[in-house]
Amino acid sequence: MPARAAGAGVELSRLSAFKPDLYHRAWSSIPHPTLPLIATAHEKSVTVFSLSTLSAHSNLTGGHTRSVRCAVWKPNLPSGKLCLVTASFDSTAGLWRWEGDVPLEEGTKKGESTEIDVTRRRNNNDSDKDNDDDWEFTLVLEGHENEIKSAAFSPSGQYLATCSRDKSIWIWEDVGANEGDDEWETVAVLTEHDGDVKCVAWCPDVPGRNISSYSPDVLASASYDDTIRIWREDGDGEWACVAVLEGHSSTVWGVQWEPKVDNTKFPRLISWSADKTIRVWTLEQDDPEASLSQPGAVQSPFKSGLGGIPNTMRRTLKEEWRCSAVLPSVHTRDIYSASWSKNGRVASTGSDGSILVYEECAPSNPSTTPADLEEGDSNVIVKPGEAKWKVLGKVSDGHGPYEINHITWCSRYDAGVEQRGVEEMLVTTGDDGIVQAWQLKESIEL
């Protein structure tokens, strides 16, 4: 039964699993940012599924000698173009481009489906070779010494970050004159973490990211050393760690930025850990900076972010981040994955096989503090009036006895939804090789 909070909650029910079953451990499933496609990493390959039919669209095989840990979509490509980067345990990242002639029809109205004709691409008689003919493996990125655990594109697609068991983060830049030239250069190798780097995530291109005090490209990383680090580019091509976020007591498996914020606040960050907690992190922004938006304000030549700081001063520059919330502790083992939806809800899953959905709600009294914080947790600093979190729903043993490795929110395009591309669903990926879609229904206790 789903958990309830404050008389309301959500019920999670299974939609159809994506077909075909993969029959081997699957690591993650990443939705395309604008199209009804989702890429699942498993074994030495990637299966791209259609979100319209919940069936396979195409396969990417033959590029790696060991398991593919994740696959990420390059954003902002011209219509009809697809590009994926795969991160593998063979210590390389591969770049793939779709060279097929499948028609892509962009929706023109809010909620209108973005269609992809997948019926021509796959039927029960197709061979794997037929299904990957239209994906071209165009480039191998080499440099890491051990398994690559995660990869992520910056919002513009100019930068790609990869991280590895070798404790390093590599930042690659697309320096090709035209899209498809596939010319990439290493612009930074970051080695400050003391353990495996499990995850990298770029701050999304939301209004709050572009406050004048900050450089636009911001990267977060999570590590086996129990910390999160924040990285920025200084305007001269140098990348620096500007903050170390401490509070978790075990491996930090991942981080994700808040996908939708108002115009004045820098996006928050969530992290999840082997310590069975999910934490929310907030950047402490200087009030004087906010005053610069007032008429007649004068911009100081020395910003509180990296831009504008002389080289001799950059080493001492630090940002102040605080843990502003800990979500209710329900998981009984490692939390492997969490996802923040565009409507503000958070979903999580992990080693215990449970799926949790949380929601943030403002306290009734602005002077109160959240009641769901870990007792005696001195790392949590809550300011008056900040919201608390509650559990909206729970499913136990979502993939039976198997661990669930990944969870993500994505838009629904299947035939069972009225507003295609508007309503969200959850997708979980597990050790059983199943990619499972979940529907959320609002419920109210009378």
UniProtKB/Swiss-Prot annotation:
InterPro entries assigned: CIAO1/Cia1, G-protein_beta_WD-40_rep, WD40/YVTN_repeat-like_dom_sf, WD40_repeat_dom_sf, WD40_rpt
Listed SUPFAM superfamilies: WD40 repeat-like
Gene Ontology annotations of biological process type: iron-sulfur cluster assembly
Protein name from the UniProt record: Probable cytosolic iron-sulfur protein assembly protein 1
Basic and acidic residues bias (residue ranges): 106-128
Role: Essential component of the cytosolic iron-sulfur (Fe/S) protein assembly machinery. Required for the maturation of extramitochondrial Fe/S proteins.
Keyword vocabulary terms for this entry: Repeat, WD repeat
PANTHER family cross-referenced by the UniProt entry: CYTOSOLIC IRON-SULFUR PROTEIN ASSEMBLY PROTEIN CIAO1-RELATED (PTHR19920:SF0), WD40 PROTEIN CIAO1 (PTHR19920)
GO CC annotation: cytosolic [4Fe-4S] assembly targeting complex
A Pfam family hit: WD40
Family from the record: Belongs to the WD repeat CIA1 family.
Gene name as annotated: CIA1
WD repeats: 17-59, 63-106, 143-182, 192-241, 247-291, 330-368, 398-446
Top-level taxon of origin: Eukaryota
Origin species: Pyricularia oryzae (strain 70-15 / ATCC MYA-4617 / FGSC 8958)
Segments for region (Disordered): 106-133
